[in-house]
């Protein structure tokens, strides 16, 4: 019984692998081998140059509604500056 189940699982795995490897998907405008027809590329460039697809940012954007970032002071719980603790051997830099 164990051998039959193993063979069944192997056949199912083989069927799945063959299904994925034998099928081929071509996107619209693409030819086999990943090449595009010259007419499609030219039409794409013309569409990009027309300027009709330019999106404008709305005046009330969500970024404006975000609260400002609060800066954390560089002092630890004991009141010592963290810069001095991180870089004890540095001189002349603040």
UniProtKB/Swiss-Prot annotation:
Residues 1-23 form the signal peptide. The modification Glycine amide is found at residue 33. The keyword Transport does not apply. GO terms for molecular function: gonadotropin hormone-releasing hormone activity; gonadotropin-releasing hormone receptor binding. PROSITE patterns: GNRH. It is found in: Secreted. It comes from the Eukaryota. GO terms for cellular component: extracellular space. Its main location: secreted. Keywords: Amidation, Cleavage on pair of basic residues, Hormone, Pyrrolidone carboxylic acid, Secreted, Signal. The keyword Secreted applies. The modification Pyrrolidone carboxylic acid is found at residue 24. Belongs to the GnRH family. Stimulates the secretion of gonadotropins. This is Progonadoliberin-3. It comes from Carassius auratus. The lineage of its organism: Eukaryota, Metazoa, Chordata, Craniata, Vertebrata. The gene is gnrh3.
């Amino acid at each position: 019984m164990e051998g039959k189940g193993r063979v069944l699982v192997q056949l199912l795995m083989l069927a799945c692998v063959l299904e994925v490897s034998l099928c081929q998907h071509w996107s619209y405008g693409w030819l086999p081998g990943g090449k595009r027809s010259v007419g499609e590329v030219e039409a794409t460039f013309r569409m990009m140059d027309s300027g009709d697809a330019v999106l404008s940012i709305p005046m009330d954007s969500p970024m404006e509604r975000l609260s400002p970032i609060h800066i954390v002071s560089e002092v630890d719980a004991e009141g010592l500056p963290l810069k001095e603790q991180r870089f004890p051997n540095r001189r002349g830099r603040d």
